[in-house]
Amino acid sequence: IYVGKLADVKIQPGFQRMMIKGSMKYLATAKTCIIELVGYDKVFTTDIDRTQPEFSYEIKDVEEGNYYVKITTKDKEGNTSLSETYNVDVYGTEHIATYYPKRITDIQFVIADNSLNLIWNQADNVVEAIVKYYDSNEQLLTLTVKGDAASTNLPNWKATSILTVETRILPSETALDIVSLPISEYTLPDDPIVEIPRTNFA
C-alpha cells in the first residue's frame, strides 16, 4: 500500500539553510514526512499538519553546497509513499564572496547647486545599497539606493568625509535570504575652489 506523495515541491535555498514547501492535496492518510539529505547521513522527520495551507519545513545550519533531498511520506501503519529526490544549492560565505558589490566609479561635482553625483557600476543580483555619509552639519545620513541605479545625487555633503556603501544581494530569484557584502569606503572630495573673475576689478 502506497501513501500519497507531497506534491508541487519547491526547495528554496538560503544562507546555510533551506526551506521545503509543497502541496498536501494527496496526503489524505499520511501522518509524517521524512526528509533525507542524501550522502550526508542526515534524516529529519516531521508531523504533517493539515491545518496549514501548505507543508513547509526548514533545515537550518547546513554547510553551503549542492544537496540531493529525498522526501517520503508515511501513514500511521508505517506504509510509505514513493520517494522523490530534489536538488538544491545552499549558499554560504564562499559563494557570496564571488559576487561583485555596487561600487562608485566616479564622483561628479554639480556647480549649479553644490551637490555631488555618485556614478555607479552595474552589478548582478544587487537588491539595494545602503549609503551612509555626513552632511555639511556633520549629521550622519542614510540613503537606500536601488540595485539598478546608475547614479545618486547628494544635495548636502561634508567635504573630505568618509562615505560607506553596504551592498545587499539576493543570489537567485528563489533565494530566501538577502545577504550583505563587505562594506566599501570612499572619501568625498574637497570643496572645489571657484575662481572669482577679475574683469570687474580695477
Predicted feature locations:
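Recognizes extended acidic, P/S/T-rich segments that occur
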Residues: 11, 26-65, 130-160
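Beta-strand residues in well-ordered beta-sheet regions across diverse protein folds
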Residues: 21-23, 36, 58, 70, ...
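Short C-terminal domain-edge/linker segments immediately following a structured domain
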Residues: 52-53, 66, 101-104, 161-165, ...
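Solenoidal tandem-repeat scaffolds enriched in leucines and small polar residues
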Residues: 104-184
